[in-house]
């Protein structure tokens, strides 16, 4: 399994990480959302994992509008949401949407892939439409691997620098997004949402670590990384963010 393929994130990677994502998300933030019928826009929806996690936690009726750049993922996501929910798909730039009439904007593992200007556009769209926003699982730049190795700090730093390529905010994205909403006078709630991976996540740990090392080495080709590493546990730190008008 690879995390990406020629056209974007591989569906197999998204399926592999879904149980860890489900366990990590801060479900208590959902209780802070306004009550009532839901029109939800899921940005960068992937295979629809956010919809599968969130739809059962929101009141009915629900209308979901799924956005992704990858038509393969949109097709998978549209088929996978629970019955009784209205589902539409749109292949579009998630940072250039008219959100009028949207009762909730949501995304998972998206903010750290965006540049400063893209986040500012997204925040302004939410503010203009007065649409609450729930953004989950943004990486914050820290991963703890057990057993530890002397190379881990350099590995983590190189990975974070790779995340910042092309002007992306990477590990700073969640904090920047929170500050932007606050600047507009909104209330922001944040929660830690770490992956806690153990022996039962063997395949996910191996796949994540291969991608982690590959990105770090792309950033710093001379990076020394231990071979045949026997990892037993990994904690990957994320942050969930809820912004309310």
Where are these regions (language model features)?
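Short catalytic micro-motifs in class I SAM-dependent methyltransferases
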Residues: 109-110
């Amino acid at each position: 399994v690879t995390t990406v393929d020629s056209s974007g994130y591989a569906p197999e990677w998204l399926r592999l990480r879904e149980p860890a994502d489900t366990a990590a998300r801060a479900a208590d933030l959902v209780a802070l959302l306004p009550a009532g019928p839901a029109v939800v826009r899921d940005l960068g929806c992937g295979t629809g994992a956010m919809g599968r996690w969130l739809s059962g936690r929101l009141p009915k009726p629900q209308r979901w509008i799924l956005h992704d750049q990858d038509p393969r993922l949109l097709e998978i996501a549209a088929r996978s949401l629970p019955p009784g929910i209205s589902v539409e798909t749109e292949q579009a730039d998630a940072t250039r949407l008219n959100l009028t009439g949207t009762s909730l904007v949501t995304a998972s593992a998206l903010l750290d892939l965006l540049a400063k200007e893209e986040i500012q556009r997204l925040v302004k769209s939410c503010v203009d439409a007065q649409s609450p926003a729930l953004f989950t699982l943004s990486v914050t730049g820290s991963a703890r691997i057990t057993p530890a190795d002397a190379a881990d700090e350099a590995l983590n730093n190189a990975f974070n620098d790779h995340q910042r390529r092309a002007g992306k905010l990477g590990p700073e994205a969640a904090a920047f997004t929170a500050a932007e909403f606050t600047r507009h006078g909104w209330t922001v709630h944040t929660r830690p949402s770490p992956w806690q991976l153990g022996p039962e996540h063997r395949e996910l740990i191996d796949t994540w670590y291969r991608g982690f090392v590959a990105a770090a080495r792309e950033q710093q080709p001379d990076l020394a990384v231990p071979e045949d590493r026997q990892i037993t546990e990994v904690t990957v730190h994320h942050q969930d963010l809820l912004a309310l008008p």
